[in-house]
Amino acid sequence: MKELFLIIGAPGSGKTTDASLIAQADATNITHYSTGDLLRAEVASGSELGKTIDSFISKGNLVPLDVVINTIVCALKAAPTKTIIIDGYPRSVEQMMEFDKVLSEQNEICLKGVIEVRVSEEVAKERVLGRNRGTDDNEEVFYNRMKVYTEPLNEILDFYQKKKLHFIIDGERAIEPIVADMKELIKKIQSI
């Protein structure tokens, strides 16, 4: 059975970097995906699912929830490792509920933990505005992204806390101790 870990956190929390470093350090045992990468890879594959995804993306439309979840589940089942990390998902209560429903209807993938990389809004803002990645990293866009992240957050955290799947990592430190703590946490959860 595949063991899935979801890594969530504010923009600038370091969740993508953390997940990426963990998977790189143990590539024979851990695979890291981001939802955007999975959708782009499916389009590039030329599959029927990829053509469906492309028909939305090419028009600038959001890919429907069922298509996104189908893409994620197919990738998880086909992953080359037993342990899989996805960062930045779920982003909404609707995504969370639908994903939970789909996972409960199959027996190949087990959600083991939802790890929140917790940072203050000040730290997140400092990191995002300091990284100069492009036009999307301005203050107005940052606050909009924070709003999108924080609006459903309490409901998402409550849901996973009730299932005893929510774990917190302090993201306001240097990357090395964060990654070390996250690796340790994943090992600990897997041994339960």
From Swiss-Prot:
Q: Kindly list the positions annotated as binding ATP.
A: 12-17, 131, 173
User: Main location per UniProt?
Assistant: cytoplasm
Q: Which gene encodes it?
A: adk
Q: Which reaction does it catalyse?
A: AMP + ATP = 2 ADP
Q: What is this protein called?
A: Adenylate kinase
UniProt cross-references to SUPFAM superfamilies, sorted A to Z = P-loop containing nucleoside triphosphate hydrolases
Lineage, top-rank taxon, reads Bacteria
Single GO MF descriptor: ATP binding
